[in-house]
Amino acid sequence: MTATNNIITSFSDEERPSVLTFDQIKEMKAQGITFESHTVSHPDLAQSDSSRQESELANSKQVLDKKLNQTTTTIVYPAGRYSDVTMELAKNNGYKMGLTTNNGLASLDDGLYSLNRLRILPTTTAENLLAEMQTNP
């Protein structure tokens, strides 16, 4: 089984307590964990001007692509906040999809840049997850 972690790149660069460093991220990546973008500094993208959004999306992707030798494909919007401008900028910066915090199963009907998801918490059991999947078609 694999997992994906979403990285706020400036936090990892600063080596904040309880935040993965890039050395730790590389070690985990070598074991099969994947890493995607959660911006540079975790702003409210819906309230940010287009220049700030562009910087957050582009710079985070560039850092992850370079440091992890990968093509970062997914932007995970901080606090699930985004706008039509955000989605367009994500696409223009080479992201293939965007994840929201809207609870539910992802559907192409929602568009690739506004995908729902089920939140998995440390307390989520297999039974909880199955029940959530059955109630959120």
Please annotate each region the language model reported.
Residues T2-T4, T39, T86, T100:
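Ser/Thr-centric signal marking residues that sit
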Residues S10-E14, D44, R81:
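Short histidine/acidic/glycine/proline-rich micro-motifs that form metal-
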Residues E36-S48:
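Substrate-binding clefts and substrate-entry loops adjacent to catalytic sites
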Residues K26, A30, A46-P137:
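C-terminal active-site subregion of NodB/CE4 polysaccharide deacetylases
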Residues M1-Q31, V63-K66:
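Active-site beta->alpha N-cap acidic-glycine motif
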Residues T2, T34, K96:
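Residue-level detector of anion-binding/catalytic polar loops
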Residues N5-T9, S37-T39, A79, R117-R119:
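A cross-domain feature marking catalytic cores of carbohydrate-active enzymes
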